[in-house]
Amino acid sequence: MPWQGVEETIAMRKFKSFLGGLGLVMLLAVGLVVWARLPPVAVGVLLLALVLWLLLTRRGRQTLSVAGVGISTLGQRLGASSVIVIGIAGVVGVLVAMLAMGEGFQATLQQTGSDDTAIVLRGGSNAELNSVLERDNLSVIAQAPGVARGANGKPVASAEISVVANLPKKSDPTADANVQIRGVGDEAWTLRPNVKIVQGRRFKPGLRELVVGQGALRQFVGLEVGQQLRLAGQQWTVVGVFAANDSHDSELWGDMQTVASAYRRGSSAQSVTVRLTSPQAFDTFKAALSSDPRLKVDVSTTREYYTKQSEGLTRVIRVVGITVGTIMAIGAIFGALNTMFAAIAARAREIATLRAIGFRGVPVVVAVLLETMLLALLGGVLGGFVTWLIFNGYTASTLGSNFSQVVFQFRVSPQLLWTGLKWAMAIGFIGGLFPAVRAARLPVTTALRES
C-alpha cells in the first residue's frame, strides 16, 4: 500500500505546517502585546541589539547583504512600495488625529482645575447643571475650616450658578448651539488668577452685563464687546473678553445674583468653589462638610472634578480612534502582504541562489522584515508629520458635561507620534513576516523551478 504511506506523509506535512503557522500566529499575538507596552528606552535597547547583531555576526552581515539588494530595487517597485507607505501613513494619520482630539479635550479640562481649590456640589450630582445648593448652605460651606481668606478677611469662596443658552454659531449662523453662562461672585477672579480680561472690562454687579471667553467669541455670533444679547427675555451687554486657557474660555460670565434672577433660580446656587489654605487642607475641608448634619454635599478638588468630566468623552474618542485605526490597519496589512509576496515571488531565483551558496533562513527572514519595516517607518513618519502639520493646535468644540459647547485644541504630542510609529512598525512587521517565512521555507529546487 505505497500510496497510503504517501498520503499519510503528505497529511503529516500539512499538519506540521498548520501547527507551525498556528504557533507563529500565537507568537505574533504575544509579541504585539509586548510591543504595545514597550517604553522608548526598551525599544532603543532592541534597536541597538539589532544593529550590533547586523554588524558583528556572520548571519547579521549576510542579512545586510540580502536586505541591501532588496532595498536597492525599491525604485523599480515604486508603485507597489507606495501602497505600503501611503496605506500605513493613512492608518497613523487617522489614529493620531483621533487620539489628539481626545488628548486635547482632556488637557483643556485638566488645566481648568488645581489642587488648592475645591468645588462643592449637592450630593449625588455629577455636574453643576443638576446640582442645587440652598442659600443657608452657602455660608456654612464658605466658613468651613481649610478655606483661605483674602486681604479683606473674607473667605475666598464663590457661589456660582450655571445655565445654558442657545446662540448661533459662526460656522453656520442658521444653526444654534449651547453655550454655558456662569454667574459668579466677586471672589471668582481671585479663585482663578489665570482668567484675565484682554479686551473691555469686567461686568459690574447688579447689571445685566457679560464678559465672554475667547473660545466662545471664536465660536458664536454676536459676542463682540458692545454687542447686545437677548437672554431669558432680557437684554444683556457684552462688556469684555477674557482669556483663561482652559475650559472657562468657552463660557460667558455675569454677576451671580443677576443671572439667578433672570433665570428664576431664586437665592440658591449650583456650586461653591473655594480656595484652600493649602492642598493639604483639602482633607480637613472635606471632613468638616461631610460631618455637618446640615449638609449633604460632594466635595472634590477642582482638578479631580474637571478630570472626571473629561474621562467619558476621552474614553469614547480613544475607543473609536483605536477601532477605526485597527480596521484601517488590517487593510494596510493585507496591502503589505500582497506587495511583499509579489516581491518575494519576483526574487525567488535570487533568494534560492543565495540559500544554495550558504545563506541560511534567518538572514532571509530578517532581510525581508527590514525591507518591509523600512517602508512602514517611512509611512509612519509621513502620517505623523502630516497629522501634526494639519491638526496640532486645530480648534474644535464638543458638548461637555453641562450640555454646553467646550472649545479645545487638538494636541498632537510626542507620545501620540510615538504611538503612531509603533503602530506603523507593527503593521510592517506583520506584513513582512509571513512572506519572509515563506521565502525561507520554500525548498531551493522548488524556488528555482517556479521562477
For each feature predicted by the language model, list its residue ranges.
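N-terminal Sec/SRP start-transfer signal
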Residues: 3-23, 50-91
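Short beta-strand boundary microenvironments
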Residues: 175-219
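Hydrophobic, regular-secondary-structure patches
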Residues: 89-180, 199-201, 206, 287, ...
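Mechanotransmission and gating elements of multispan inner-membrane complexes involved in transport
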Residues: 168-176, 221, 225-237, 241-321
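Short helix-loop junctions at transmembrane helix boundaries
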Residues: 21-44, 381-422, 433, 437, ...
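Transmembrane alpha-helical interface segments in multi-pass membrane proteins
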Residues: 341, 349-395, 419-427, 435
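Hydrophobic alpha-helical transmembrane segments of multi-pass inner-membrane transport and secretion
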Residues: 78-105, 314-350, 373-382, 430
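Peri-transmembrane interface segments
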Residues: 15-30, 105, 278-334, 343-345, ...
